[in-house]
From Swiss-Prot:
This is Ninja-family protein 1. PANTHER family: AFP HOMOLOG 2, NINJA-FAMILY PROTEIN MODD. It holds the Pfam family EAR. InterPro entries: Ninja_fam (IPR031307), Ninja_motif (IPR012463), NLS_NINJA_AFP-like (IPR032310), TDBD (IPR032308). GO terms for cellular component: nucleus. Keywords: Nucleus. It comes from Zea mays (Maize).
Length: 393
C-alpha cells in the first residue's frame, strides 16, 4: 500500500520547499518492464505488489555461495637438536666471554664444538656471526646423539672385535683339522697291529731261526721260489700261487694237477728241525706281520713279483672255480676200447662246442674228444659223449 498512498494535503504548508525526491520504489517501478512470468517462478512474490524486490535464487552447490577462506600458514618452528646448543653457548659466554664460546669446552667431560649460534627467532638459516668469524652462515648443524669423535672410536672398536672373532674362528678350524688328522693317523697305526720296532724284532728272530735250516729249501730247478723260515703250509700256498700264475700264462696246462702236488711234496720234505723252529715262532706272530717279514727276506724284486703273482692267482682261482661249477661235466661212454675220459663243456653256443679234457687240459671238439679217448674216428661222436649232472672238480 505504500506504493499507492496519496498526499491528501496536496503540499499544504510546504511553502517554497523543493519538491520531494522520488523514492527508490517509484524509480524501480518506472524502470522495470512488464513481467510476463505470472509470478510462478522460484523468485516470484505473490501479492498486490508483484514488482517488488525478489528473493535470491538458491543453489544446490554450497561452494558457489561460500567465499574461499585463506588458511593462515603455521608459524615456523625452531629446529630441534639433541644437544643443548643455546644453553651451553650461554654458559661459555658467561665463563669465557663472547670470543671463546665457538671453541671446544675443555674439561673432564666430552668436548662439544658448536657450529652456529641460533638467533632468538629460532631460524637456523639466519645465524648471526658472533665471535671471531668461526660460525658458518647458511649451514645446518649436524644432528646426532653422540659427537663424531665417539662414533669414530666406536667404528674402530667394532672393526677390532670383528677381526678378533675371525681369528678365533680360524684357530678353531685349524684345531679341528689337526684333531681329524691325528685320529686318522691313530686308526691307521692300530690297523697295522704292531709298531715298526716290534716288526723288526720279529724279523730278527725269524732270521736267526732260518740260519739253522738247510739251504736245500731253495729249489730253482722248477723255477719256483720258496720263502725261508715259513712253515710248510705257507710254502705250499706260495708254491700253489706261483703254479696257478704259470697256469694262467699257459692255458693248455691250466688244469694239470701234477705240478701242484709235486711242489707240495717237495715243500713237505723240509727237515724236522726247521719245522719245529718255524712252528714255534710263526703262530706267535699275527697275520698282518707276515707281509713285512717276507718283504725283508730275499731280494726285493723276487718278493714283489711273488706277491703280485699270488694276488692274481687267488683272484683267477676263484673265477676259474666259479666257471667250472657253472659248466657241465662230460665223459665218454660206449667206445669200442671201453676207455672213459672226463672233461667239461667250455663253450656250447650255436654250432660250436668245445670240451676241455681234465687229463691234459686241452680244448677239443666232440670228434677230437672221442679220438682223444682212443676210439678213433666215429661217424656220430655226440652219441658217445654223456653229460653228467655234477661238474668234475
Amino acid at each position: 500500500m505504500e506504493g499507492f498512498s496519496r498526499d491528501l494535503l496536496c503540499g499544504i504548508g510546504k511553502g517554497d520547499a523543493p519538491p520531494p525526491e522520488k523514492r527508490p520504489g517509484q524509480l524501480r517501478e518506472e524502470m522495470e518492464e512488464v513481467e510476463l512470468s505470472l509470478g510462478l517462478s522460484l523468485g516470484g512474490r505473490f501479492g498486490l505488489d508483484r514488482k517488488g524486490s525478489k528473493l535470491p535464487r538458491s543453489s544446490s552447490v554450497a561452494a558457489m555461495l561460500t567465499t574461499p577462506v585463506e588458511v593462515p600458514a603455521p608459524p615456523s618452528l625452531s629446529r630441534a637438536s639433541s644437544l643443548p646448543v643455546q644453553a651451553e653457548a650461554s654458559e661459555v659466554e658467561r665463563k669465557q666471554g663472547l670470543d671463546g664460546w665457538g671453541s671446544c669446552r675443555e674439561g673432564g667431560g666430552l668436548g662439544v664444538q658448536h657450529a652456529a649460534r641460533l638467533p632468538a627467532s629460532g631460524n637456523p638459516s639466519s645465524a648471526s656471526s658472533v665471535g671471531e668469524g668461526q660460525i658458518l652462515q647458511g649451514t645446518l648443524m649436524r644432528t646426532s646423539s653422540l659427537p663424531a669423535v665417539i662414533e669414530a672410536s666406536g667404528n674402530d672398536d667394532w672393526k677390532k672385535r670383528k677381526e678378533a672373532q675371525s681369528l678365533k674362528r680360524l684357530e678353531v678350524k685349524k684345531k679341528r683339522i689337526e684333531r681329524r688328522n691325528s685320529l686318522a693317523c691313530n686308526t691307521s697305526k692300530e690297523a697295522a697291529g704292531q709298531s715298526p720296532k716290534e716288526m723288526n724284532a720279529n724279523t730278527d728272530k725269524l732270521v736267526s731261526s732260518d740260519e739253522t735250516i738247510v739251504s736245500a729249501n731253495e729249489s730253482h730247478s722248477s723255477g719256483k721260489h720258496l720263502v725261508k723260515g715259513l712253515p710248510p703250509k705257507y710254502q705250499a700256498t706260495i708254491t700253489s700261487e706261483d703254479s696257478s700264475s704259470a697256469m694262467r700264462k699257459k692255458p693248455n696246462s691250466a688244469f694239470k694237477g701234477t705240478a701242484i702236488t709235486e711242489e707240495q711234496n717237495s715243500s713237505s720234505s723240509v727237515p724236522s728241525s726247521g719245522e719245529a723252529i718255524s712252528s714255534v715262532t710263526a703262530p706267535s706272530l699275527p697275520l698282518l706281520s707276515l707281509v713285512p717279514i717276507t718283504a725283508t727276506l730275499g731280494s726285493r724284486e723276487d718278493q714283489s713279483i711273488l706277491g703280485r703273482a699270488g694276488a692274481r692267482a687267488n683272484g683267477m682261482g676263484d673265477v676259474e672255480r666259479r666257471m667250472m661249477q657253472e659248466m657241465p661235466g662230460v665223459f665218454t661212454k660206449g667206445l669200442s676200447n671201453g676207455s672213459r675220459v672226463e672233461g667239461f663243456l667250455y663253450k656250447y653256443s650255436k654250432g660250436e662246442v668245445r670240451i676241455v679234457c681234465i687229463c691234459h687240459g686241452s680244448f677239443l671238439t666232440p670228434s677230437e674228444f672221442v679220438e682223444h679217448a682212443g676210439a678213433g674216428k666215429v661217424d656220430n661222436p655226440l652219441r658217445h659223449i654223456v653229460v653228467s649232472a655234477t661238474p668234475n672238480l
